[in-house]
Amino acid sequence: MAPDDSAIPARVVTSLPLAFTAGAAVGALGGMIGLGGAEFRLPLLIGLFGFAALAAVILNKAMSLIVVLTALPARLATVPPADLGAHWTVVVNLLAGSLLGAWAGASWAVRMRGATLYKVLAALMVLMAAALVLTHTATVGALPLPGPVRAVAGVAAGFGIGVVAAIMGVAGGELLIPTIVLLYAIDIKVAGSLSLLVSLPTMLVAFARYSRDGSFAVLRSNLRFTVTMVAGSIAGALLGGLLLGVIPDRVLIPALAVILLISAAKLARHAPPDARQAGLPDN
């Protein structure tokens, strides 16, 4: 389908200094809670920089992938390989669902009308806010599930997380880490490293699906912007890591949850003039 000009934002801002600054702010927020911050970057891509929903999701996914690749060596170095190897079945169990979920989620995203995608993203932002509060204020304990039930639950949870990660363009660590702790009774530090091993192939599958629709055109036309914002995100994440614990969780977590909820409200009202996605080929 030819691009519908009515759905293309009137003004896309690609200022490199602004991109770096916004990326740094997002990285710092994520770094202070041990995450990448992609859920905070998505509403900025739409609201501040003016990208249409699907374009913003694809850009966010690209940036999330680079941030994960950058963080992977350092994160894996904090956990002995033997500890990770002992839990390889957990990674396989979750990937069995998340890879399918990533493909399905990306397929749904490219087929959704623009107005629908904005509302879906808003709902998922609310989900992320709830997950943020629950995982940082409540003690997550393992569920006493029989082996076969746990395996089925792992596939189902992986599928759901893969869908969410693909549609939002995030790595999914916000949901993967508590899931690993809850289903498999694994220490949260090890769970963080295992989540990266699940996130990376899951994101690659979502990319593969998006590329079938020519959606990567937004990356080619905004390459400098993407690289600059990623550089800011990485710098911000390092700063956020240094600030870890400076702001008490009882203050930081509710504040971040409120930011997500405000972003969700704005996304829900951010419907394009035409319901199809801006400037991206149809299937």
Language-model segments: residues:
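Transmembrane helix boundary and interhelical junction motifs in multipass membrane proteins
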Residues: 34-41, 167-179
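Transmembrane helix-bundle signature of multi-pass membrane transporters/permeases
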Residues: 57-65, 192-202
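Alpha-helical transmembrane segments and their lipid-water interface positions
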Residues: 38, 64-75, 105, 202-210, ...
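Non-catalytic alpha-helical scaffold/packing segments enriched in small hydrophobic residues
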Residues: 154, 175-179, 199, 203
